[in-house]
Amino acid sequence: MDTAWFIGFMVVIGAVIGGATNSLAIKMLFRPYTEKRIGKWRVPFTPGLIPKRHQELAIQLGHMVVHYLLTAEGLGKKLKSAVFMKAMNDWLSTELLKLLRSELTIGELLEDKLGVKEPKQTLLQKTEGLIEKSYDRFFQENRYKQIGEVLPRGVNEKIDHSVPVIAAFLLERGQALFSSEEGKERLSKMIDRFLLNKGTLGNMISMFLGNERLVDKLQPELMKFMRDDGTKRMVEEILEKEWAKLKQKDVALIEDQLNKEDIVEYMTTALEKNVTFYQWVDQPLCDWSEPFEDMLVINWVPKLVDAVSDLLALHLEGLLEKLNLEDIVREQVEAFSVERLEELVLTISKREFKMITYLGALLGGMIGFIQGLLVLFIG
């Protein structure tokens, strides 16, 4: 009976010592939080392991995260994965549709998000400035060149081929004019002015023939003249010669005849009236964006996501270096309080720490049992 009590006592003592030792070891991972001293003598094992190695832990965690966890290769694979691409595609499509179906205007977006004041007026001013710069640059580069050199080859050829058409058009308009009553009246006035300028000779002709008779004689002859093929060839030759002369003149000749301010203002106003985008600036997106929804969501969004993913994957290593993730992780871990870290670790590993304590008690009890047997055997 004494033997059983002795061995049981040894087992209990061993279990208590083993369990208490492991429990103390676990607590000494974190505690004490600060160094303890008795006079000038530092108490051993203070502070605890984690507080003592807090800075080294932060450095190693930063190194581990950058070189083994958040690597450029791993993030690049994630960016190009089908799951991520689909998630980004769906998210961007949803957000884009939400925006397109809203009451917001392009002007409001520019003003709220980019800080552009009076967006439409600013846009028109930028357009006007761009037109003015283009105007100045064109004449600065081409002022002393011939007009024929400056015009594109296609324009030159088109005008050359259009000369017969222009000649025919002018003759047709002339026939239409002088065959009408209005044209006849104008012709009569022209004859009057002509005869008036001829003095006595003109008066004699008017007196013998009469104005009406002269108009009646001249109008059919004029119509016959304008319908004649020779007249058409003559007009074509005149136009071709004048066009050839014009092409040999310097561009400066045109510049002298133009008013830059009027042209810039005219082109800006024409763009504002005829380019739909200028009108959309002040209209809600939902009023005009519907025809573009499918094109944007089906065609543009996937291409945009793919392009952004490729761009990020290509420059990811450089971006990570510029972000200095290692320093960020280190600073965050250093700023993390040991108390909070202890609470976090214990919350996650509470069951495992208890099992370690129980294991220490079990091993201590087994050692106590063996020691009891040895004592009895030796005694």
Curated annotation (Swiss-Prot):
Disulfide-bond pairs as recorded: none
Membrane disposition: Multi-pass membrane protein
Main location: membrane
Keyword Ribosomal protein on entry: no
GO CC annotations on file: plasma membrane
Localization: Cell membrane
Chain ranges passing through the membrane: 6-26, 359-379
UniProt entry keywords in alphabetical sequence: Cell membrane, Membrane, Transmembrane, Transmembrane helix
Keyword presence, Metal-binding: no
Family: Belongs to the UPF0754 family.
Stated name of the protein: UPF0754 protein BpOF4_11355
Organism for this UniProt entry: Alkalihalophilus pseudofirmus (strain ATCC BAA-2126 / JCM 17055 / OF4)
